């Protein structure tokens, strides 16, 4: 029992000692904390002073830094713009080069196409020329050319020139026919059409009186009215007589007149002189492939002799102008009229029916009597 009580007392003392120690420790820690606070406060004041100085220095350096930064930004922007411009120029040059290349290629293709077309056209022309040459050599073509020339001569004579539909079934027809002078008598032919299938004498124009196209009339007049044409005249008062001195002037005048009519594409020319007894010279020209044939017509014998002497001069002068003389014919006016009348008779025989054949095929009197029976027709030919 006593032992336990002793231990408790000891423990109580020990506990009291411990409490004293704790109080001492608490006091020591508080003192230390206060000391530390003082130190920290002093250091904080120093730090604040240092920070304020640094802030002032930094505030001074801020505008210089901003200036530097703005300059750097401007420099960078300029470099960017320069780079962009160079890039754009480079791209534009590339595009321009590409376009030029494309154009050149197109031009080359176009030139090739043109060259090919020209080759094809030249080949076709050569083929056509070869065929045409072969065709020219053929005798049928030669005959066709002869027929064309004959038809052109026939057109120059103009047998059907005075024919017009206006003259048919008109009261003033006869007055118009009288004004058109002709070498032949005005022979009018009525051509009546039959129904050859039925072999009946019924006339087409009896059934349809209003249709004038079923009846055709032809008037044979050999020449056009020469008053309408403009004949070239050269009057020279100096050329009075056929003297030897004035022969050169005569020759030059005739040569000039022939060349002038050829250049104007006229087939006729006329030269009249001041002395009336010499008369005038009528010239007819025919041109074929730069080859000329001249027909002189005059009634005076001295003029004919002079024209015969002019032949070598005319040949030389026309050769200088690129024209060759095939023939030169000298006629009287009476011979030319007879020659023309013979030609006209031949052409009329070729283009109209003969008298016997006309009587066999068409009984004109019978048809005429049948026309009289119909009272609807007012005029008869």
Curated annotation (Swiss-Prot):
One of its GO terms (cellular component) is bacterial-type flagellum hook. Keywords: Bacterial flagellum biogenesis. Gene3D superfamilies: 3.30.750.140. The keyword Transcription does not apply. It holds the Pfam family Flg_hook. CDD domains: T3SS_Flik_C. GO terms for biological process: bacterial-type flagellum assembly. InterPro entries: Flag_hook_Flik, Flagellar_hook_control-like_C, FliK, FliK-like_C_sf. Belongs to the FliK family. Two-domain protein with the central portion of the sequence acting as a hinge or connector between the two. PANTHER family: FLAGELLAR HOOK-LENGTH CONTROL PROTEIN (PTHR37533:SF2). Controls the length of the flagellar hook. This is Flagellar hook-length control protein. It comes from Buchnera aphidicola subsp. Schizaphis graminum (strain Sg).
